[in-house]
């Protein structure tokens, strides 16, 4: 389905695809620092059943607004630093990718993201969700609580995950807390939203 990506079957009907960022797009130390410097000062606030909660990581949308958990993450223009990555993803995965959501994780601050399905509001139907992992290795976990199913995948520097639309609906995903991982990680998630 996605050339240059390895298929990982999850349940006979759904899969996750994993690959590597091409070497020409790898972020060196200076590039990583430039990307890290883009994180907002404040944490995004979302609505949870118990009330408003700050996300345990920094987050910013680029290109298109991202609506989820009762809030809007208002988009900024795509930084030139990310233009080559977006162009590659359009060519390698899906031509209508037009939005990026960055999450900045600081291990010293215990940053993580809990189990969730990505919001599909305003997304192009059946378009996959692409996540690029930069920096320190973390675990990318997929779960189906009703089936007590769990799959862990290492999210190393330069790892690219492609999650089909149907997989996102059927499986939750997360980057769990880690007492061992004290470094910094950036995830770049690309989606295709209707114009």
Predicted features by range, described:
Residues 1-195:
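Non-heme Fe(II) oxygenase metal-center motifs and adjacent flexible, charged/small-residue loops
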């Amino acid at each position: 389905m996605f050339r240059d990506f390895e298929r990982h079957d999850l349940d006979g009907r759904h899969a996750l695809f994993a690959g590597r960022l091409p070497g020409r797009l790898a972020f060196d130390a200076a590039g990583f620092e430039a990307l890290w410097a883009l994180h907002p000062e404040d944490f995004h606030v979302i609505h949870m059943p118990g009330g408003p909660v700050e996300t345990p990581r920094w987050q910013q949308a680029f290109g298109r607004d991202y609506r989820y958990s009762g809030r809007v993450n208002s988009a900024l223009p795509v930084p030139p630093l990310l233009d080559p990555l977006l162009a590659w993803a359009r060519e390698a995965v899906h031509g209508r990718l037009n939005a990026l959501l960055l999450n900045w994780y600081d291990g010293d601050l215990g940053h993580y993201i809990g189990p969730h399905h990505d919001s599909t509001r305003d997304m192009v139907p059946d378009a996959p969700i692409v996540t690029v992992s930069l920096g320190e290795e973390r675990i990318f976990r997929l779960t189906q609580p009703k089936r007590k199913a769990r799959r862990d995948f290492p999210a190393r520097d330069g790892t690219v995950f492609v999650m089909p639309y149907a997989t996102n609906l059927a499986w939750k995903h997360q980057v769990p807390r880690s007492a061992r991982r004290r470094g910094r990680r950036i995830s770049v998630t690309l989606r295709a939203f209707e114009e």
